[in-house]
Amino acid sequence: MADNFTILVGTIGQGMNVSGDSGETWTKIRNPIPSECSIRALRTYPDDPHRILAGTDGLGLFRSDDNGLNWSGVDSPIGDLQVWSVAVDPANTDTIFAGTRPEGFRSRDGGKTWDKLSMGATLECPIGTPRTTNMVVD
């Protein structure tokens, strides 16, 4: 592992922090991701670890192309949902999956358009609320 590597930490209720010096110092990400936001999912792109997706609690997805220094919102129909999981297809990184509550969404064009996926979960659940908490693409 390199001597200086970047660490991103997503929190519940305190946004995201980034360290560019292996955890020695930290900076809070403040814009455009609110500092009180909950970050529920972080995923790097398999072909470029400097590209990162962040799933939030009610603000949709954000993307960074520079190792977490700058972020932009990803326009999608899930902007007001809790994004619990994010996956990127290693064979085609334009294909992105986002797990919400209880359904999932897929983009085949890098996040420009999205399709809702029927994954068999329903909102009716005897205990708790169903959520798509993990997604893996083979």
What are the residue ranges of the model-derived segments?
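Extracellular glycan-interacting surfaces
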Residues: 1-138
